[in-house]
Amino acid sequence: KLAGEKLMPMMAEKTDLAPRLHVLPDFHGNRSPLADPEALGVISGLTLDQSEESFLKLYWATACAIAYGTRHIIDAMNDTGYDITHIHLSGGHTASKVLVKLYADVTGCTVVMSDCEEPVLLGSAMLAAGALDAEGGLARAARQMAGKETTHAPDPSAKADHDRRYAIFHQMHAHRQSLDSMSKT
């Protein structure tokens, strides 16, 4: 939380906080869209600097990498005919203003968050109520039970920097794959 509080003002001043620091976040493999459980994480541009600013830049680059992974999934889905324009976000990521902003800016999607503290549980309750309501069903239950939403639109001024970093993200995937093939005996 402290890192996010320090990063938000920095992100308001410029859209690329670490132009030469890049992360592939696959430290536990890649589930989607590559479906490679053996994929490894990569950090490029790491220095020996131990300052708070250096830590914040690494945190930010890692948060970007998580958002680029989400964009990679959305792009793969859109390439097969979907037209994803909104991300409905719930859970732990909603607590990070940095991630919420990056999801919007990186993907170009509007991020929608329920003001309900537990939106997944609310959705389950809506399904149960809808199943019990023979006349109105799920649609009526959802209308009656839904709370307010908060939306976060992408910042168009961040697009060029994130498009450049996203291209680097893809190049790092290709480099990692090449290095992996050279490393196999």
Description of each model-found segment:
Residues 1-5:
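N-terminal leader/propeptide and maturation segments of large enzyme subunits in energy/redox metabolism
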Residues 6-7, 12, 185:
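Intrinsic disorder/low-complexity segments enriched in polar/small residues
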Residues 116-124, 137, 161:
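Generic hydrophobic secondary-structure packing signal
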